[in-house]
Amino acid sequence: FNVEETQYTKIVLGKVDATDADFGQNANLTYFIQPSSQDLPFEISPWSGVFSVNGELDREKEDKYVLTVVARDNGHEKKLSSSVSVEVLVIDVNDNSPQFFKYDDLIQWTHSETHDLSNNNFNSAMMIPLYKATIQENAPIGTTVTRVYANDSDFIGNGNGLILYSLPQRKNQHTLFSIDSKEGLITTTGRLDYENQ
């Protein structure tokens, strides 16, 4: 079974079905998960074999469950059983934000002109990491200023954990810095003048 990570309340994933060639009680089957554990977010109907998820699935904690489901007949003298492995793959959803690290400080950032930013995926006030760097005003264009670092605990294989960096810029403002979208390396793209800024 494949199922997305989230919180579930008795959602049916499918059915485990077994047959028995005997008759009467000897052919009536009871299903159960072995070993039975209260910690697992799965359950099976003992009579129908309907397999459900009931609880939280978090791919960052557990990406796959392999369970043993037993089908046992209800014979009076001797109960016979058979088992099958059930694999549940937890599919990643984009539920974690990228987190910066190796920064120098945390500051509260408030911007009254949020609507003027061309890349305005920001709240008007937030705590943001601050990277500090110094550079000479006569540094040539293309000089490395600093590097920023971030990670995302989502699965990178489907793109949810892939991080791309960008620098928000004011509309119609001369750009002095750029960032490598993959590496987080910030470089100069214009001439810096200490007297102007």
Question: Model-found features: residue ranges?
Answer:
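Extracellular cadherin-type adhesion modules in metazoan precursor proteins
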Residues: 1-197
